[in-house]
């Protein structure tokens, strides 16, 4: 209920829009929790060696303020990474609720932290910091290019400017 209310007040979502987004977030948590078990399954890994990164920044959007950040945070945690959640400025309250929910679920406070920063120099410092191993961005193509211009060798996973185009022949 709280996440639905915050998604409504911050992102303008109706209950009909926010409720399935919260359900998607729960599904992401279940999916990545199960996926994490595969990383220790020798038969599944087939001789591959998994090496987690230390710190992942999840830069999430304003328009899906629950499901997308939860998916990024849960995936990074499942892969053994600490997470800094940097929400879009219009979605800071939603992000704070999400981080609190991860903590209530038992994730240690130092493994998921909130960086409710405005866009600009401080955000640049965060995503280019030498202690950050990976950035997960859901946002515009221009933002991805900006991040890459700040740090060309950045390990950037981006979902950018999608229009869900389909060609039917």
Language model feature labels by segment:
Residues 8, 12, 29, 34-169:
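Rossmann-like NAD(P) dinucleotide-binding subdomain of oxidoreductase/dehydrogenase enzymes
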Residues 1-15:
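N-terminal alpha-helical segment of soluble enzymes
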Residues 16-27, 120:
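An alpha-helix initiation/capping motif
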Residues 2-5, 23, 96:
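A generic alpha-helix surface/boundary motif
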């Amino acid at each position: 209920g709280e996440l639905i209310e915050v998604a409504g007040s911050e992102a303008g979502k109706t209950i009909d829009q926010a409720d399935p987004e919260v359900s998607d977030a729960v599904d992401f948590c279940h999916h990545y929790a199960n996926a994490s078990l595969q990383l220790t399954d020798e038969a599944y890994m087939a001789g591959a060696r998994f090496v987690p990164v230390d710190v992942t920044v999840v830069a999430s959007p304003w328009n899906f303020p629950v499901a997308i950040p939860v998916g990024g945070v849960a995936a990074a945690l499942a892969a053994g990474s600490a997470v800094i959640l940097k929400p879009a400025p219009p979605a800071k309250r939603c992000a704070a609720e999400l981080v609190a929910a991860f903590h209530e679920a038992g994730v240690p406070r130092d493994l998921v932290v909130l960086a409710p920063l405005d866009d600009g120099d401080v955000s640049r410092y965060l995503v280019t910091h030498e202690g950050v191993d990976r950035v997960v961005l859901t946002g515009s193509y221009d933002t991805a290019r900006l991040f890459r211009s700040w740090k060309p060798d950045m390990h950037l996973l981006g979902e950018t400017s999608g229009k869900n185009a389909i060609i039917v022949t």
